[in-house]
């Protein structure tokens, strides 16, 4: 029996979500459109198989084929990032980070990460996260120019003496200097951990410098700029570290891995290894730069004054309206973004003084500079007259027509 026949409620909602994704312009920087073949393998019989352990070292029988699948995913991941060891089992980026901490740290150890309000991530030591509850966390941020001051990071590291320094961000538009971070880590005897969840797709295409060989350990998600399934990975060049990481993931924080998702990761990695991927990643950066240029020309402030990657962070510290106001208004105009804190934040995390806008998903739909120029101008049109609902409706209709020129899925399930 088909899903449509058996469960009309879920079938209907899934297809409404397809309609939303097709009609709206998805510009949340952490979201992307994965490949139909990734979704196809995730809907396969692999979802039935338990496979606790690792390839050739399982606690269940009948794993001969999933062993091969996981090994393919591991090998492709290592080739992508140019590393020696990879764990492809983490169910998410947050669990990957939890696995890293479990492998390298003891409860109460000190970590130094990027402040959440300056572009960091919850799992980099925020007090509301287990990373901030289990470990003593300290933070670095950005200067008034919106950029990391590595001399200031070094000063903080020398004062706090962390056991681990975390580099990487969820809302930082500039390139990260992993080499400089390693110099700082070495100066205080700390491990260097890079969370490249947001920039991984650029890294593997050569559009952002690689955390290897500078970092002791690297984590990432497999969605976002990699366009694979939702999940996490951990990588290192050190065999002893790899053993600790494996134990930290299983049996440390996870049981049986999601083999259908690991297969999806393998398929996604094959896309990432292609020549077409390099073209895509380059276009992601080009589109983000065009987006930023237009917004600046329209009078909007970008944190750091531009972008080196896939996102721009727009600050409304000098505006009467908030990030939440902008999020809602743009949503009414058919543009999906997210409210975001900015350096110098004066509002609560539920209101914020900025928005984060990304290019990966629309680039996946085939849009280029001309489309991004148009969209950026429409974003500015909405923000210039933020309470004008009739203008928002008019722009929504215009952008729906644009979206329908770049349909990425013709059905909701594969």
From Swiss-Prot:
Q: Which residues carry this modification: N6-(pyridoxal phosphate)lysine?
A: 224
Q: Which Pfam families match?
A: SHMT
> Which residues of this protein are annotated with the site description Plays an important role in substrate specificity?
223
Q: What does this protein do?
A: Catalyzes the reversible interconversion of serine and glycine with tetrahydrofolate (THF) serving as the one-carbon carrier. This reaction serves as the major source of one-carbon groups required for the biosynthesis of purines, thymidylate, methionine, and other important biomolecules. Also exhibits THF-independent aldolase activity toward beta-hydroxyamino acids, producing glycine and aldehydes, via a retro-aldol mechanism.
Indicate what this protein is called per its UniProt record.
Answer: Serine hydroxymethyltransferase
Instruction: Family membership, please give it.
Output: Belongs to the SHMT family.
Indicate which residues the UniProt annotation says bind (6S)-5,6,7,8-tetrahydrofolate. Answer: 116, 120-122, 240, 348-350
Record flagged with keyword Cytoplasm: yes
């Amino acid at each position: 029996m088909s899903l449509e026949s058996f469960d009309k409620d879920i079938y209907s909602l899934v297809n409404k979500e397809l309609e939303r994704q097709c009609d709206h312009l998805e510009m949340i920087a952490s979201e992307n459109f994965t490949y139909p073949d990734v979704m196809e393998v995730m809907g396969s019989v692999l979802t039935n198989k338990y496979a606790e352990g690792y390839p050739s070292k399982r606690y269940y029988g009948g794993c001969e084929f999933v062993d091969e699948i996981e090994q393919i995913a591991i090998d492709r991941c290592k080739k992508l990032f140019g590393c020696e060891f990879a764990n492809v089992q983490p169910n998410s980026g947050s669990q990957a980070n939890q696995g890293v901490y479990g492998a390298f740290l003891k409860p109460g150890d000190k970590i130094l990460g990027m402040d959440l309000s300056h572009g960091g991530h919850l799992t980099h030591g925020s007090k509301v996260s287990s990373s901030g509850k289990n470990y003593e966390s300290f933070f670095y941020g950005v200067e008034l120019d919106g950029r990391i001051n590595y001399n200031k990071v070094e000063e903080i590291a020398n004062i706090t003496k962390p056991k681990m320094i975390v580099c990487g961000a969820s809302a930082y538009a500039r390139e990260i200097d992993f080499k400089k971070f390693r110099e700082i880590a070495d100066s205080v005897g700390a491990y260097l951990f890079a969370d490249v969840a947001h920039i991984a797709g650029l890294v593997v295409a050569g559009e952002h410098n690689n955390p290897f060989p500078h970092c002791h350990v690297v984590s990432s998600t497999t969605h976002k700029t990699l366009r694979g399934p939702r999940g996490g990975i951990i990588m290192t060049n050190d065999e002893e570290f790899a053993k600790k990481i494996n134990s930290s993931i299983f049996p440390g924080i996870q049981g049986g891995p999601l083999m259908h998702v690991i297969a999806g990761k393998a398929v996604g990695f094959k896309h990432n290894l292609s020549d077409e991927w390099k073209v895509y990643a380059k276009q992601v950066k080009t589109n983000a730069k065009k987006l930023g240029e237009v917004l600046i020309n329209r009078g909007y402030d970008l944190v750091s004054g531009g972008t080196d990657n896939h996102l721009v962070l727009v600050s409304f510290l000098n505006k009467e309206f908030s990030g939440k106001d902008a999020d809602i208004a743009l949503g009414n105009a058919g543009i999906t973004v997210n409210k975001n804190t900015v350096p110098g934040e004066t509002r609560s995390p539920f209101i914020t003084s900025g928005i984060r806008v990304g290019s990966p998903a629309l680039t996946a739909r085939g849009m280029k500079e001309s489309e991004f120029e148009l969209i950026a101008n429409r974003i500015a049109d909405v923000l210039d007259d933020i309470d004008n609902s009739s203008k928002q409706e008019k722009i929504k209709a215009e952008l729906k027509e644009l979206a329908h020129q770049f349909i990425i899925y013709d059905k909701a399930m594969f």
